[in-house]
Design a protein with these regions (language model features):
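Outer-membrane beta-barrel "beta-signal"
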Residues: 50, 303, 338-341, 346, ...
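Outer-membrane beta-barrel channels and translocator barrels
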Residues: 33, 38, 84-86, 125-130, ...
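Residues that define the transmembrane beta-barrel architecture of outer-membrane proteins
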Residues: 66-77, 112-117, 154-160, 204-210, ...
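Detector for outer-membrane/organellar transmembrane beta-barrel domains
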Residues: 213-323
Length: 373
């Protein structure tokens, strides 16, 4: 029976200690440095978690704070630290999500590097018309501005590298970036490794390093677009002319080496809050891969009865592609909930999740708590 080398466990412990130490130093340095300029410093975030039980009482899950694709979400701890000065600043996000639908606090990856969603510094030139950014990047200027609010890959994973943002006129932003988001690594069989021009695991330098994006916004609408030379693309359009109305359509195309076939995803989103205490919304998700199309539609409504009690309901309707599997049927998961607000920052929610097809999704009920700081 094969076993790991005797030093493997020690190396794993050292790597975990190094990650914890690095994360601790990064947070401490950012807080300490920004505290010198407290006027531009902000620290905020939230923790949310919940528990759900199936009607038979056989399983308990702690990975869901509140079911549902619109008002809901998984258990999560998020910490944002930002400093924005006259000539530059820094932004940092730590976010720990539930590993799956069953566990959150018991997971062992609290100090994983993937939990650092971004850690970026920036410098402003010419009164902010030119901005230089470096670190683990996040796009704060040209993201799609819709439900996904993403760019390449996703907005919480823009890679490590550098970016230049140019704003030649009011409302227009143009960016060029170089990051490791889509870069491939050298393998032992590559000629460059055999010739010792590169080491196994080194990042390959090629056109997949570069991405370009743009956004234009005025009082009536905004439009965004991005092209990455690794064959990743996005675009969006949003209407902003009507008060209390959100209307955005996003499109993402992924034809990178990470996928077997090109993927196109569309996200239409509309929300209206023009009636006091009432929110009406609908969210769509359309995925097209190799000629097959799957659709999910989520209508949602919430109403604040008082400052303390709010009612909400949503239903995610999944429409599969019959060409892939004729036996797949359309089904819906309905999630009614009641939220009790202890304050603007603290709330507790009780919920039920009811499925029209228990082979696709199970019934459940439970409760969750959220505290923002």
């Amino acid at each position: 029976m094969n076993s790991a080398p005797p030093y493997a466990a020690a190396n794993a412990v050292l790597k975990e200690f190094a990650m914890k130490k690095t994360l601790g130093i990064a947070v401490a340095a950012l807080v300490a440095g920004a505290s010198l300029f407290a006027e531009g410093l902000s620290v905020n975030g939230y923790i949310r978690s919940g528990i759900s039980i199936d009607p038979k009482g056989e399983t308990v899950k702690t990975g869901t704070w509140l079911p549902g694709d619109y008002f809901g979400g998984g258990s999560r701890l998020r910490l944002n630290i930002n400093y924005d000065g006259v000539n530059g600043g820094a932004t940092f996000r730590y976010q720990k999500d539930a590993d799956d639908d069953k566990k959150f606090f018991i997971s062992d990856n609290w100090f994983s590097g993937s939990n650092i969603k971004w850690a970026m510094g920036y410098a402003k030139f010419l009164d902010g018309k030119i901005i230089a950014e470096a670190g683990k990047l996040v796009d704060t200027y040209t993201s799609t501005g819709g439900w996904e609010d993403g760019t390449f890959g996703d907005n919480a994973g823009a890679g490590i590298g550098a970016r230049v943002v140019i704003s030649p006129v009011e409302g227009l932003f143009i960016t060029a970036s170089a990051s490791d988001l889509y870069l491939e690594k050298y393998k032992a069989a590559d000629d460059e490794v055999k010739d010792r021009d590169a080491k196994e695991g080194d990042l390959k330098f090629n056109e997949k390093l570069f991405g370009f994006t743009a956004k234009y916004a005025n009082d009536a609408f905004f439009v965004t677009g991005g092209v990455h030379l690794a064959k990743s693309y996005y675009a969006s359009f949003g209407l902003t002319a009507v008060d209390n109305l959100t209307l955005v359509v996003e499109a993402f195309i992924n034809d990178t080496a990470d996928v077997d076939d090109p993927e196109t995803k569309l996200y239409p989103w509309v929300e209206y809050t023009g009636i006091e205490n009432l929110t009406l919304a609908a969210l769509g998700a359309i995925t097209i891969v190799d000629g097959s199309t799957s659709i999910a539609i989520t209508p949602a409504v919430s109403y604040a009865l008082t400052d303390v009690i709010s009612l909400a309901a949503e239903s995610t309707i999944t429409i599969p592609d019959k060409d892939i599997d004729p036996t797949d049927d359309t089904y819906a998961v309905i999630t009614p909930s009641v939220t009790f607000a202890a304050s603007k920052k603290a709330s507790a929610t009780v919920f039920a999740s009811l499925s029209t097809d228990t082979d696709q999704a199970k019934h459940s009920f439970g409760a969750g708590v959220k505290y923002a700081f």
